[in-house]
Amino acid sequence: TDWLEAQAFDFDVITDEDLHWEGSALLSPYRVILTGSHPEYWSEQMLDALTDYLNQGGRLMYLGGNGFYWVTNIDPVLRHTVEIRRWGGTQTWGAQPGEHYLSTTGEMGGLWRARGRAPQRLVGVGFTAQGPGHGMPFARQPDSFDPRVSFIFEGIGDEELIGDFPNLVMEYGASSFEIDRMDFQL
């Protein structure tokens, strides 16, 4: 939000929890929304709300990474409790028997991709790999010069690297650790 404030933009903050409970009606007043975070853990209600918003002509600036990855739910009784059943992803551990299903809904956990809701279908890119290493900045690509999206790049030079500075997590650059990619097969 620092950049929005520095540029004197009026904005509202909507949390994942708000979106889960209130649905697409919460988004409908806005022409454009943006994810300024790491929206990795989204529930079906959140995905449905975003999909409905986009289908109604809303626009999304997806500024995060590794988004919309794990099947997630917010407990309808203990509303402060988020449940995630991780299996089938990067295999940082193996789920034990009986741990593939969410206890709050009975639905299969794991990856949204395995449930037919790949993030690539929603936002064009999705998580594909992770690993340590020196991060890198981004160079503008030809589509970034399309007049329809020129406002996104106001103040950024044609040859300027995006994220060409140290960061707090992986030492340097706008990209590192987790990698998203396009996949037209999904």
Protein language model features and the residues they cover:
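A general structural signal for short secondary-structure junctions and capping/turn motifs
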Residues: W3, S24-A25, T51-L54, A174-S176
